[in-house]
Amino acid sequence: MKVSNFSSLRELTIAALVISSVTACGGSGSSNTTPEASVTPPTPPVSETPSEPDWQAGVYEPESNFINQCESPRSGIDPFSGNSYPDEAGTAMDEKLWMRSWTNDTYLWYDEVDDNDPANFSIAAYFDQLKTTELTPSGTPKDNFHFSRATEEYNTLTQTGVSSGYGVEWEFVSLTAPRELIVQYTEPNSPAETAGIPRGASLKTIDGVDFVNANTQAEVDVINAGLFPSESGNTTNLTFELVDGSELSVSVTSADIEVSPVQNVTVLETSAGKMGYFQFNTFIRTAQGSLINAFDQFVNDNVTELVIDLRYNGGGLLALASQLSYMVAGPNQTDGAIFETLQFNDKYPTRNPVTGSTISPTPFYSTEIDYNAGLLTNTLLPSLSLTTVYVITTGSTCSASEAVINSLRGVDVEVVQIGTPTCGKPYGFYPTDNCGTTYFTIQFQGVNNKGFGDFADGFIPSSTPNFEFELPGCDVQDDFTKPLGDASEGMLSAAIQYAESGACPVSTASSTSASLISGTQPNTPSDSQASEQANASESLIAIKPPHTQRDELILHNKINEPILRGDN
């Protein structure tokens, strides 16, 4: 895509006011009539209505010409930053031309984006198509990670770990009849946990509607409203079939749910030694304290083996991924080594286009981070100094989770993969707000200490790994019949057996390289997959789960935030 500059003329049209003097004539035929004084009405204030900027194919003005020029500008104080909103009156075209110039400047594959006339799209639809349409070697879309979200909602979720709902994380097996929705896990102290909804429960009815087979729009509307409440205080009646075949009926009321990123921290006794285990669901700021507490426990208990359960972890903050990797590998293996180096598009071989700083590798962060200030502290993190680690993965294991796997392999820590292929996202972005919407567009690719970062089709467990994207390990499906953290749960049990014997369970020992060839990945349906299911048959009506987009958008992405060394 050829880039050049042009000047877009912006004119404000101000209507001229014509002031007329009005003269009144008096008396009949008097020659001494005196004209009345002329009256000049006050000039009304000029209303400066922004005019539409112009689009010219292949020509890109600097994004600074359009940023914060908003069709519906915010006013007042941003509660998260304490600063005034920067918005000014603008137009929808201003917003679209900003994202167009921003994409052309920072998008990793900017030269693969079609330059379509923004006038033909809404603001949201225009952003949706500002991405490559190329495919990976397996035939899947090259860019599956292109999203936007209301800035207030994004800040609420990432900075507070709070979202509205029942506290259930779902496995979407089928969105159209016959539907299947299974409970992955529930958040601690949530309405769902309080109601006793267990892992593996399959939803059967919602507010009296047959969830599995209902196929009228009215019924599906009831399902969507009950299953995905838009606010707290909504009460819904749910019926489940449990793994033992029994039925559970509960009444739950939606509430603000605090996400607990680290769960089920435990130490297991195995013949290979003491094995630490924890379920890690998302790399958000509030996870730092819980991770430190978990590793303090492992260090105190003299753990020699570690299983990190990343099966539902779509990613998040790179800095936190670096900290976790350090806590696994310890100082001797990471001192002076690179956690990850970011590579931007070919316009910026040495400079970060977002921060303006010279590109420098991200180290393995060995201290706590003040995430509010973006500063490293002097408080050293606990570490296990392991040479082998076991990771549990599925197609929902993505981005920053994959960065942990890749970075540890970069310093020769053996990563044994138990589960199914990861999602394949060596890419990331800087969330960028404009006019109340935060945009996520791929801006960089990460490579490890050895320069490897080509796993666009995911990391794949294999009994006979031959390629860089294949890891030693076992192909094991998610086991919903047992609680997470239970030593008999299928994936954790396979990790224990591998640690004890160096071999996979007999029934799961085959390689999953076929997944790469077919392009299949077991995963929670994305919005595009949901759309495909919805369009599969005109006679089938699909539910539309809004929080799958939330998960992909916020929790399932590699997010880079600058971290500086503090003075303390």
Listing of model-derived features with the role each one plays in the protein:
Residues T13-I19:
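Hydrophobic helical h-region of N-terminal Sec-dependent signal peptides
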Residues M275, T282-E305, G314-N568:
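C-terminal "post-core" interaction segments
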Residues S20-A24:
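C-terminal motif of bacterial Sec signal peptides marking the signal peptidase cleavage site
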Residues S4, L157-T160, F228-S230, L268-E269, ...:
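A general structural signal for short secondary-structure junctions and capping/turn motifs
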Residues L17, A57-S64, F459-N466:
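Secretory-pathway extracellular proteins and peptide precursors enriched for disulfide-bonded cysteines
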Residues G29, T33-E36, P41-L306, Y312-G314, ...:
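Flexible, low-complexity junctional segments that flank or bridge functional domains
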Residues I14, E95, A487-M491:
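Alpha-helical structural motif
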Residues K2-T13:
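Bacterial N-terminal signal peptides that target proteins for export
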